[in-house]
């Protein structure tokens, strides 16, 4: 992190005071190298050193990122592991002024590793979530994420598990598809999304991250209520107009897009053009431990690199609350708090 001048420190303090939601965050991608070492000591015959763990997070493209994500998930094996990473993640979020988070958990990857029972692992996540709410005042919802390139049968298992478990766990709020969209578009998941919607689940989708605007059109066509990334929408004026007209929330992840090489240069990121075009954007960290940028940093980038004023940042924070799946009463209270933040 760069050194800060006094006015920079004041701006960061404002960002921390600003109540905001994190809407595009992967539980597994929030595992720091230090915690990965701790997990490795629990499960590996030859544990990782801190240097070795940091090397896993050192990559140059989207494929390298997927391999780093794999290295973390293969060391998440017990309820205690999931409780640990959930509690630590939410504690770090609360320290940045995050009041609510909607967190992707890669249930599809859990099944990929052959762990047939997800419920015991989820029990650990819930313990971590409830401890964090009691200790830090932050709330959280879960979004069960399927891996698109594992296919529709694998996704069906994830989405139906979300519907089944939601009957007893209202913290399970929605479903999504992540993974490598270069291999599989959204269209094959249309019927599964309709089934999930009918089960009372909200619908999200990663789209337009590593492919063109057609990926975003596909996500809209299967009913996604929020779009993760949507980076390439900037190349399709008709799509930009539709997104602005419908006010479909876009979960923008600036540092993520640059670090994975999906956007080659920070200055080229369309976040400012999205905002000026009237899109309903929110700022998010995606995988903060892997991209070395938390939500506070993303707001700082918006201010320092893209010229977003304090009033703009307040608008982005309000967008994050409005785009969340929180009940209306809580949204109204948090929006009031944002207006009162100076």
Residue positions per predicted region:
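Conserved hydrophobic beta-strand within the GNAT/NAT acetyltransferase core sheet
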Residues: 203-205
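Metal-cofactor-binding active-site regions of metalloenzymes
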Residues: 1-201, 210-215, 221, 225-226, ...
